[in-house]
């Protein structure tokens, strides 16, 4: 009898097949788009035969159908109540109230990113509600649909000046203002008010242009008679920043420049203090040197100088000289910003380094860096790049992006030296032939040591290139990446010298380059779905690295300034992406996604603001190691500048949300005032670029605080409409219509009835219904502003009014050319003019209506009696909002 065949039970393992590449994928790996399509650039057409079921790793947030959605397939449940949050730290324990507000998800005592099942993007969690997590966290997943946004709706902004031409990267503060219609309108409103007012004021003044007008601010220092407030001495601040420019002109250097002994630090100070300080505090941040070799080179350099009395350019001593100058300058910067006392560091702090950077610039430009390069020359360029980032002067430009030319030179020089990705290829042969007389010589560094140092330098260059992508959205210069095995780099990046961080950073490079390709290949059509997925993956990978490093005793990432910096870089990038989403969805009238994005934007902005305030409150303590403040300050400064713009953008949109009360707006404006006070009081006296932005932000605060009387957005719309009708447009510059195309459409719509330019209700109604229809869908959206948490922040962080730099220019009585300037001696001392010139007239500049001197009565008004009455309306509006002294910095 024939035995029945055994029926083999088939395995019911769900399989998915991509219709593009037919690559089979198991249920544990169901990305969309799949990796093959990403590799071949077919992400738009990557679809599966069946909908991709979202597994445990990719949970979809709780959803509900939005009946009025223009995209019925999108289902999102927006959280309405801020009490649905509960904060937990890394161990799952509830935080105290202070940690809830101050230590956000990237805080020192909490995970860098939240440990959630759906791998949500960062969000600040507040309150003591009973629920464990909000109803919606993480970016929307659109059931396989790729969503696109326009990150440059008005294109790139290219600014042409006498000294330079700059194309602003898409995430800089200038680009944020240029992209956002609300911030653009506010910017042009300020420019119009400043231009018209200062033109009239200059006609009454004898000295009209910078830098003489800086002397005007000595009036602030004399405002409080008999009061000693050294912290508010604005003239000293100006003089301090003026020194940066005074030292630029030091004369030409000859081929054999005779060494000026006062420019070269003493040998004992360099060998015993500078190099020892650099070994323990700078080398982990600057993996550019083989330290024993550097010490030997410094010894040879001083021996040569003591013999000849000159810096030789034949044997490369000039580049060792530049390395010594830059290391000394950076060491002194680190010490001065940490205020560390002690005899071991006092020789460095007492060195006069004012001429060091100009000397380095002269040496760089006087040699053939455009044709050939050496290892020491490349090290000088990288040290200069590092210094420009940390320095208090305006090294990288106001937006921190004027570094591409130097980075291009660095990357090109590195490739000329053979430094690149090929060094990380296993088994790739590298033949290094070290000639006699070269520096470093074969006696001090063999070929293997050269290769190891080359690998470190390439990782450091890569770190800078990718960092500026996250900070400013700059296009990466290095357009290649390579997956590298961790084990192959253990010998190069050791824990002992502190370079282990760069071994981990290489692991993130492919993700960073993918983010770069998504935003740079076509900024007008960015796949935001793929971009958010990449950002989430980047956060997860960085969280894993954070966990790995924290599990070791040698290095704690919470105390490492590089981990601190990268976490802030990711937060800045997240906020900039969310802001771009808000602007794009508003333009497309996609109110569902817009509401979600604006809520998430405000949450991450509030979270980062609390981080900044906590950082400033802890600056005097050993937060992140006080010697690292000179390095970490820079990323916090950039974040604070960006956050102020985002806060302004949110405040200007509050009129659209009916659940927001008038007192809530005022709370946000006061929160902005507190944030700016901490920002400028901590950084305004140290960083020139921060100090320059103070005056613009003070005018912003004036405009926003005017909301207690009228809505600032309506007021600005009215002003711009009048300017378009009656104002003069300068030749060669972008006109108001070019900068504000949406308001130009509004102007065309209302131009048939000029009287409507004064009807605020009609203007706002036309804007919301015809020009910006997204406003019609906002009245039922409940924007959670976290008012109670903002109040807690305001109560917790106090600032002494006597030390408040942001507020001092308002509180002091301004006496421009007053009694202090009424005598011949004061005129001579303030303006350095010849004694034969008569003294300037006395002016008391307090309020518009109580002016004396040349500005009698209404003479300060912008338009003359013969001008249009409609334009005169703008004059009255400016007088209602601003104080005359607000315009002094712009004279």
Curated annotation (Swiss-Prot):
GO terms for cellular component: mitochondrion; nucleus. The keyword Transcription applies. It comes from Candida glabrata (strain ATCC 2001 / BCRC 20586 / JCM 3761 / NBRC 0622 / NRRL Y-65 / CBS 138). This is Oleate activated transcription factor 3. GO terms for molecular function: DNA-binding transcription factor activity, RNA polymerase II-specific; RNA polymerase II cis-regulatory region sequence-specific DNA binding; zinc ion binding. InterPro entries: OAF3, Zn2-C6_fun-type_DNA-bd_sf, Zn2Cys6_DnaBD. It comes from the Eukaryota. SMART domains: GAL4.
């Amino acid at each position: 009898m024939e035995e029945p065949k055994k029926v083999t039970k088939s395995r019911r393992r769900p399989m998915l097949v991509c219709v593009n590449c037919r690559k089979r994928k198991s249920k544990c790996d169901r990305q969309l788009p799949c990796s093959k399509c990403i590799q071949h650039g077919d992400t738009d057409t990557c679809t599966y035969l069946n909908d991709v079921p979202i597994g445990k790793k990719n949970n979809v947030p709780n959803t509900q159908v939005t009946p009025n959605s223009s995209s019925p397939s999108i289902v999102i449940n927006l959280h309405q109540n801020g009490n649905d949050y509960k904060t937990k730290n890394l161990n799952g324990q509830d935080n105290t109230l202070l940690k809830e507000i101050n230590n956000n998800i990237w805080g020192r005592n909490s995970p860098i990113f939240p440990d959630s099942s759906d791998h949500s993007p960062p969000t600040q969690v507040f309150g003591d509600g009973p629920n464990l997590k909000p109803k919606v966290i993480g970016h929307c997943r659109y059931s396989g649909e790729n969503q696109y946004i326009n990150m440059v709706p008005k294109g790139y902004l290219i600014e042409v000046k006498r000294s330079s031409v700059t194309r602003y990267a898409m995430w800089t503060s200038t680009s944020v203002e240029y992209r956002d219609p609300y911030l653009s309108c506010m910017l042009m409103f300020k420019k119009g008010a400043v231009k018209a007012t200062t033109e009239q004021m200059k006609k009454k003044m004898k000295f009209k242009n910078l830098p003489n007008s800086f002397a005007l601010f000595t009036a602030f220092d004399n405002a409080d008679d008999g009061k000693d407030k050294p912290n508010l001495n604005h003239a000293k601040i100006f003089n301090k920043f003026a020194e940066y420019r005074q030292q630029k002109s030091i004369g030409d250097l000859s081929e054999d420049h005779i060494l000026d002994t006062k420019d070269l630090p003493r040998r004992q100070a360099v060998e015993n203090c500078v190099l020892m300080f650099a070994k323990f505090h700078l080398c982990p941040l600057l993996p550019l040197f083989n330290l024993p070799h550097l010490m030997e080179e410094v010894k040879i350099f001083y021996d040569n100088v003591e013999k000849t009395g000159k810096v030789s350019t034949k044997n490369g001593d000039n580049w060792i000289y530049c390395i010594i100058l830059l290391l000394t300058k950076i060491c002194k910067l680190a010490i001065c910003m940490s205020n560390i006392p002690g005899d071991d560091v006092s020789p460095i702090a007492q060195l006069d380094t004012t001429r060091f950077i100009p000397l380095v610039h002269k040496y760089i430009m006087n040699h053939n860096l455009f044709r050939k390069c050496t290892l020491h020359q490349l090290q000088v360029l990288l040290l200069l790049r590092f210094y420009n980032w940390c320095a208090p002067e305006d090294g990288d430009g106001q937006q921190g992006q004027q570094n591409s030319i130097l980075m291009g030179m660095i990357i090109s020089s590195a490739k000329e030296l053979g430094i690149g990705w090929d060094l990380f290829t296993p088994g790739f042969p590298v033949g290094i032939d070290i000639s006699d007389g070269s520096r470093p010589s074969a006696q001090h560094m063999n070929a293997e040591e050269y290769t190891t140092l080359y690998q470190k330098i390439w990782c450091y260059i890569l770190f800078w290139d990718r960092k500026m992508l996250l900070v400013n959205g700059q296009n990466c210069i290095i357009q290649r990446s390579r997956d590298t095995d961790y084990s192959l780099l253990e010998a190069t990046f050791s824990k002992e010298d502190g370079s282990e961080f760069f071994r981990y950073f290489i692991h993130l490079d492919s993700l960073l380059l993918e983010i770069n390709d998504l935003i740079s290949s076509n900024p007008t059509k960015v796949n935001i779905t793929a971009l958010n997925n990449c950002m989430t993956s980047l956060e997860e990978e960085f969280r894993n690295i954070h966990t790995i490093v924290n599990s070791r005793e040698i290095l704690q990432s919470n105390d490492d300034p590089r981990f601190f910096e990268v976490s802030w870089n990711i937060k800045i990038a997240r906020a900039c992406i969310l802001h771009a989403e808000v602007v794009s969805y508003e333009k497309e009238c996609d109110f569902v996604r817009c509401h979600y994005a604006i809520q998430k934007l405000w949450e991450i902005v509030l979270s980062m603001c609390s981080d900044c305030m906590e950082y400033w409150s802890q600056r005097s303590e050993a937060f992140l190691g006080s010697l690292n403040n000179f390095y970490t300050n820079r990323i916090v400064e950039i974040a604070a500048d960006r956050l102020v713009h985002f806060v302004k953008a949110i405040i200007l949109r509050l009129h659209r949300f009916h659940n927001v009360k008038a007192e809530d707006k005022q709370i946000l404006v006061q929160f902005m005032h507190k944030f700016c006070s901490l920002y400028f009081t901590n950084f305004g006296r140290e960083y020139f670029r921060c100090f320059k932005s103070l005056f613009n932000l003070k005018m912003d605060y004036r405009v926003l605080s005017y909301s207690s009387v009228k809505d600032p957005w309506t007021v600005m719309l009215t002003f711009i409409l009048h300017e378009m009708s009656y104002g003069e447009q300068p030749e060669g510059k972008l006109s108001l219509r070019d900068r504000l195309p949406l308001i130009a459409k509004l102007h065309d719509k209302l131009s048939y009835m000029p009287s409507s330019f004064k009807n605020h209700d009609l203007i706002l109604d036309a804007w919301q219904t015809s020009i910006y229809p997204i406003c019609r869908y906002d009245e039922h959206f409940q924007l959670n502003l976290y008012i109670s948490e903002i109040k807690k922040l305001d109560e917790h962080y106090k600032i002494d009014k006597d030390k408040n730099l942001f507020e001092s220019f308002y509180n002091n009585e301004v006496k421009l050319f007053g009694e202090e300037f009424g005598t011949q001696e004061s005129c001579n001392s303030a303006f350095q003019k010849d004694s034969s010139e008569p003294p300037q007239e006395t002016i008391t500049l307090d309020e518009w209506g109580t002016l004396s001197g040349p500005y009698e009565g209404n003479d300060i008004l912008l338009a003359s009696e013969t001008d249009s009455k409609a334009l005169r309306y703008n004059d009255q509006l400016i007088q209602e909002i601003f104080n005359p002294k607000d315009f002094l910095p712009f004279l």
